[in-house]
Amino acid sequence: MADDTINAINVDPSEVEKFNKLAGEWWNKTGAFATLHEINPLRLNWIEENVKRGYVSADSQKTAEMGLAGKKVLDVGCGGGILSESMARRGADVTGIDLGTENLKAASLHAEQSNLQDTLRYQHIPVEALAATHAGQFDVVTCMEMLEHVPDPAAIVDACFKLLAPGGVCVLSTINRNPKSYLFAIVGAEYVLRLLDRGTHDYAKFITPAELDKMAIDAEFARQDIIGLHYNPLTKRYWLAQNVDVNYMIAVQKPLA
């Protein structure tokens, strides 16, 4: 896709370039994306729990009890494929999409090295464009740590709704916007603890749960669950809890009718 086309889509070119420059770091578990590797088991398990709890289908071969196994999954803003690969390993048929060409090269190479080519593929396409041609084609859609990096997150949420089959589950994650999240996600994570590169986040783009709820409701999703993601810098331990002051995930469902 030409750069001028990307510029016309819902994307901040500077954000794409920022992550493209870090493409070589995606699978370095102690590098720039170490935090994503550390939180991935938590978010993966929570995604699967919500699929088991909320997924509904008339297809007897795709039951909720099976979790991700056998489901057709779309990972929006997949980056280097950390979450995409982990879902494929749990038996899902996964498509990852991103606008960072270097990210996708890193993701595709690692998928090939991991022998996951049969159940995992990547595409360089905006989610809105995919929604125009593949509406209702996915059982599960994930969009993690991406909404706070785009100009119009509501359009992303709406596209996720369109891509889901009725009864499907969508899981979204982002960062709350308040003084505590600024202190933890920017001052703490980027400047004090150096968990993330400086400039990774823009506080103005953070999204409150109420704002994300409204985006989901406007897209006609039904809320299923919400959870906060927490970190203790002393013990270097991550965990999930009800407090959503900083990082959080929500699970929503596309109604059957």
Curated annotation (Swiss-Prot):
Q: Where does S-adenosyl-L-methionine bind?
A: 43, 77, 98, 144
Gene Ontology molecular functions: 2-polyprenyl-6-hydroxyphenol methylase activity; 3-demethylubiquinol 3-O-methyltransferase activity; polyprenyldihydroxybenzoate methyltransferase activity
Matches recorded under SUPFAM superfamilies? S-adenosyl-L-methionine-dependent methyltransferases
Q: Which organism is it from?
A: Psychrobacter cryohalolentis (strain ATCC BAA-1226 / DSM 17306 / VKM B-2378 / K5)
Role noted for this protein: O-methyltransferase that catalyzes the 2 O-methylation steps in the ubiquinone biosynthetic pathway.
Q: Which Pfam families match?
A: Methyltransf_23
What name has this protein been given in UniProt?
Ubiquinone biosynthesis O-methyltransferase
What cystine linkages occur within this chain?
A: none
Encoded by which gene? Answer: ubiG
- Quote the EC number: 2.1.1.222, 2.1.1.64
